Curated annotation (Swiss-Prot):
Oligomeric and partner information: Homodimer. The RNAP catalytic core consists of 2 alpha, 1 beta, 1 beta' and 1 omega subunit. When a sigma factor is associated with the core the holoenzyme is formed, which can initiate transcription.
Protein name: DNA-directed RNA polymerase subunit alpha
Ranges that cross the membrane: none
Organism whose genome encodes this protein: Mycolicibacterium paratuberculosis (strain ATCC BAA-968 / K-10)
InterPro entries per UniProt: DNA-dir_RNA_pol_insert, DNA-dir_RNA_pol_RpoA/D/Rpb3, DNA-dir_RpoA, RBP11-like, RNAP_asu_C, RNApol_insert_sf
Residues forming coiled coils: none
UniProt cross-references to Pfam families, sorted A to Z: RNA_pol_A_bac, RNA_pol_A_CTD, RNA_pol_L
CDD domains to which the protein is assigned, alphabetical: RNAP_alpha_NTD
GO biological process: DNA-templated transcription
Domain notes for this protein: The N-terminal domain is essential for RNAP assembly and basal transcription, whereas the C-terminal domain is involved in interaction with transcriptional regulators and with upstream promoter elements.
Region: Alpha N-terminal domain (alpha-NTD), residue numbers: 1-226
Length: 347
């Protein structure tokens, strides 16, 4: 099995809806393979929500006007195509817009049901005069990609129901480039730089995660043909590699006090890997191994980026009684306690 170094992914947030992602190092040629796959998936396959049809009170078709409204129906529909919405519902939902003139009609005047959010309330929809009145019923559905109005035309729809083009994709723009990067003595590795811009209904980070999930599901179909087929195996991350190396360390390297060291040795715990497989209750069952010894072990493991099996991830060494984080030393009381234990052991 060929093992490749695990790439890292970093994000630089450029604006609220635009981020640049860097994936490196990639095996030669994989920058374009991964970049093109992610770009096409981001632009075409990210789920979203959009208006699929509208009904305007007193209007039978789009080629007409509404009394008291500056814009004709076609212009109103064009404005509604720019509406950015998100929906948690899998079924079609209905929103309502009711406004009496005079004044401007914006997306903020739309009343969405629970589970639906309008993300650009400042969007201009129409302008009303003193006698103007606008009542619109909007149907929102979830989907992906682009669906033309002709496909949104439902058979048997009531008179006055106007289908509109639906742009479901929440991703506006994706570009990528591949640069060369160095790994030790080799300079032919790829660095993929992906620039993603989205609508306000989704963050670039979530959009990229969605694209990655889709590709994993699809590529899994090929893997299922033979799960034992040989391929390039991705190696552990640097942090994982450090942990693996730390597991092999003898507990002598932890520089524990005499009490803690002897208790662990007597219990048959000889390496860090054997130590992190124990819980606090396991260690407390060891003779002469008390809470002070537990705290000491947790501090030493924390310095290696490790923890006991059941230790919470929020462990803070500065909260341990008798331990000075700044100097990395224990209080005199703890030292005397250990000295007393050593003398007792000798007796």
């Amino acid at each position: 099995m060929l093992i490749s170094q695990r790439p890292t992914l970093s994000e630089e947030v450029l604006t609220d809806n635009r981020s640049q992602f860097v994936i490196e190092p990639l095996e030669p040629g994989f920058g374009y393979t991964l970049g093109n796959s992610l770009r096409r998936t981001l632009l075409s396959s990210i789920p979203g929500a959009a208006v699929t049809s509208i009904r305007i009170d007193g209007v039978l078709h789009e080629f007409t006007t509404v009394p008291g409204v500056k814009e004709d129906v076609t212009a109103i529909i064009l404005n509604l195509k720019s509406l950015v919405v998100s929906s948690e519902e899998d079924e079609p939902v209905t929103m309502y817009l009711r406004k009496q003139g005079p004044g401007e009609v914006t997306a903020g005047d739309i009343v969405p049901p629970a589970g639906v959010t309008v993300h650009n309330p400042e969007l201009h929809i129409a302008t009303l005069n003193d006698k103007g009145k606008l009542e619109v019923e909007l149907v929102v559905e979830r989907g992906r990609g682009y669906v033309p109005a002709v496909q949104n035309r439902a058979s048997g729809a009531e008179i006055g129901r106007i289908p509109v083009d639906s742009i479901y994709s929440p991703v506006l723009k994706v570009t990528y480039k591949v640069d060369a990067t160095r790994v030790e003595q080799r300079t032919d590795f790829d660095k993929l730089i992906l620039d993603v811009e989205t609508k306000s209904s989704i963050t670039p980070r979530d959009a990229l995660a969605s694209a990655g999930k889709t590709l994993v599901e699809l590529f899994g179909l090929a893997r299922e043909l033979n799960v034992e087929a040989e391929g390039i195996e991705i190696g552990p991350s640097p942090a994982e590699a450090d942990h693996i190396a730390s597991f092999a360390l003898p507990i002598d390297d932890l520089d524990l006090t005499v009490r803690s060291y002897n208790c662990l040795k007597r219990e048959g715990v000889h390496t860090v890997g054997e130590l992190v497989s124990r819980t606090e209750s396991d260690l407390l069952d060891i003779r002469n191994f008390g809470q002070k010894s537990i705290d000491e072990v947790k501090v030493k493991l924390h310095q290696l980026g490790l923890s006991l099996k059941d230790s919470p991830p929020s462990f803070d060494p500065s909260q341990v009684a008798g331990y000075d984080v700044a100097t990395g030393t224990w209080s005199t009381e703890a030292a005397y306690d250990d000295q007393d234990y050593a003398e007792t052991e000798q007796l």
